[in-house]
């Protein structure tokens, strides 16, 4: 009984404990209420943040949707404009139809190859159990040779594997289209088609890279030029197809660029050489056109005195070189023509070879007049071109000496006249150059000093006539007379030139004075004008 009472006392709480519990309960109630209020506030804040984030995301999605719609609309408009612009050409329409047909065929082939390869992969582990791997090396090699598929199958396997790998990764354009489809359900069909097309492009683009670089090297330049001359494709899908179907032809491009650079360098070099020779030829022709009388006289003299001895010919050449006669023109012309022929024959291009084949006209000597005598014919027969030596007779030589000497004297006189004429032309050119340099905008020396120039020309003509008369009197002593006359003429020319230079210097000084006076007057007027304002 005592035990029962003790247990009841232990189980029943005392009055003090009950009072403590009752006091603690009202203290715990406000703490729990505060915790619940804080939780509610935190939940409300979280909900508000989520609502704001969702609103921002929704706005961004709407903006992206609008942008994608605008882009698609613009691409559609561009495609329509291109079709309208190129719709009149039936050839372009036919090409587009062919491309679409090829595209569908390639799609079907790729699908069939993928199915076959998938079936083979499923059957492969059944046909070849794992026990084969434990065979020795020789058996393993033989079995590998026996089991080895053909090169075409290997290529297909590689292709399918590459396409399968690419199925996992998609380009940025595809991801964009998928995002548009998520945002707007109207674009679902278009994006699916574009995904299929892009997968096929990846497969077709991987084919040439798997085959190796041999096919790239085998391609010719002709194929490259045709590929470059093809018309541009219209529409975004066609552009993607063209970009995917183009093989990586970096090696061939480098070769092609090198060949083009070498051909252009050769063409430029040939053009420079031809320009040089043409400039020489034109300058010589212009000189010949400026003095046709000199050429005629030179040709007549040469036809008359063609059978002279070698020493006299050398003397005439020396005198011609001193006086700048047309022989220099002929020699330079022949030299330029010979070099031009050599260059054109060395060239590798058939166009220039055809030009070189045409024979350049060789400047033949002026034919002898109809009134030539038998003695002149005999003299012409003595020329080195004839190659025949007629029988020498003393009587004929004595008879032929008199007219020959007379002709020689005439030729020397004509040579002197030509020389004087050339010197006069040179002086005129110098004077013109000096006049152009010292020309005033309102005054020209040619107008003011025309009378003086005419008087100088008349004086020169008189001097020439006097020299010709003095030369015609003495025939035997021609070489010493020629040298003396050339010295006298040189001295006279130098005196005239010095006098002309002095006159020009005086004219320049006068013009400078006039110019300074004009400048002073202009300055004074300027100062007056500035003072007035």
Curated annotation (Swiss-Prot):
Coiled coil: 40-72, 416-531
Listed Basic and acidic residues bias regions: 107-126
Gene: Cep295nl
Name of the molecule in the record: CEP295 N-terminal-like protein
Alphabetical UniProt keywords: Cell projection, Cilium, Coiled coil
Subcellular location: Cell projection, Cilium
Tissue: Expressed in mature spermatozoa (at protein level). Detected in retina, lung and kidney. In brain, highly expressed in brain-stem, cerebral cortex and thalamus with lesser expression in cerebellum and hippocampus.
Organism: Mus musculus (Mouse)
GO cellular component terms given for this protein: motile cilium
Chain residue ranges for the region called Disordered: 1-40, 84-176, 286-333, 370-399
């Amino acid at each position: 009984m005592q035990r029962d009472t003790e247990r009841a006392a232990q189980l029943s709480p005392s009055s003090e404990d009950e009072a403590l519990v009752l006091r603690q309960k009202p203290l715990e109630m406000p703490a729990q209420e505060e915790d619940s209020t804080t939780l509610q506030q935190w939940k409300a804040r979280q909900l508000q943040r989520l609502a704001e984030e969702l609103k921002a995301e929704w706005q961004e999605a709407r903006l992206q949707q609008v942008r994608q719609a605008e882009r698609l609309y613009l691409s559609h408009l561009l495609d329509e404009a291109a079709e309208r612009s190129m719709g009149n050409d039936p050839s372009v329409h036919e090409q587009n139809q062919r491309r679409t047909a090829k595209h569908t065929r390639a799609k079907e082939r790729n699908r069939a190859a993928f199915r076959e390869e998938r079936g083979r992969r499923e059957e492969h582990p059944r046909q070849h159990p794992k026990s084969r791997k434990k065979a020795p090396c020789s058996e393993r090699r033989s079995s590998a040779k026996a089991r080895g598929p053909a090169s075409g199958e290997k290529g297909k396997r590689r292709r399918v594997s590459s396409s399968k790998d690419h199925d996992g990764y998609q380009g940025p354009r595809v991801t964009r289209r998928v995002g548009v489809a998520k945002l707007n359900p109207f674009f679902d069909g278009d994006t699916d088609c574009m995904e299929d097309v892009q997968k096929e492009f990846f497969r077709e683009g991987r084919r040439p890279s798997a085959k190796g670089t041999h096919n790239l090297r085998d391609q010719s330049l002709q194929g490259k030029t045709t590929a470059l001359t093809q018309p541009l494709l219209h529409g975004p899908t066609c552009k993607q197809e063209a970009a995917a179907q183009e093989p990586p032809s970096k090696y061939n491009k480098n070769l092609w660029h090198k060949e083009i650079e070498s051909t252009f360098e050769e063409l430029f070099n040939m053009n420079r050489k031809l320009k040089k020779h043409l400039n020489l030829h034109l300058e010589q022709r212009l000189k010949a056109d400026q003095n046709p009388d000199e050429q005629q006289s030179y040709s007549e003299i040469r036809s008359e005195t063609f059978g002279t001895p070698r020493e006299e010919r050398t003397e005439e050449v020396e005198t011609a070189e001193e006086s700048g006669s047309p022989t220099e023109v002929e020699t330079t012309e022949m030299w330029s023509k010979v070099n031009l022929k050599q260059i054109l024959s060395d060239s590798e291009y058939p166009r220039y070879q055809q030009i070189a084949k045409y024979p350049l006209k060789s400047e033949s000597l002026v034919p002898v007049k109809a009134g030539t005598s038998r003695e002149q014919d005999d003299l012409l027969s003595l020329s080195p071109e004839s190659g025949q030596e007629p029988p020498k007779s003393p009587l004929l030589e004595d008879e032929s000496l008199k007219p020959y000497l007379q002709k020689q004297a005439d030729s020397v006189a004509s040579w002197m006249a030509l020389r004087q004429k050339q010197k006069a032309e040179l002086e005129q050119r110098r004077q013109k150059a000096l006049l152009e340099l010292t020309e005033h905008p309102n005054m020209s020396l040619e107008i003011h000093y025309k009378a003086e120039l005419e008087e100088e020309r008349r004086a020169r003509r008189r001097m020439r006539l006097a020299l010709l008369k003095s030369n015609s009197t003495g025939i035997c002593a021609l070489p010493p007379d020629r040298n003396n006359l050339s010295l006298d003429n040189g001295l006279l020319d130098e005196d005239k030139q010095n006098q002309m230079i002095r006159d020009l210097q005086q004219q320049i000084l006068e013009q400078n004075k006039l110019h300074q006076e004009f400048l002073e007057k202009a300055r004074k007027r300027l100062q007056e004008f500035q003072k007035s304002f």
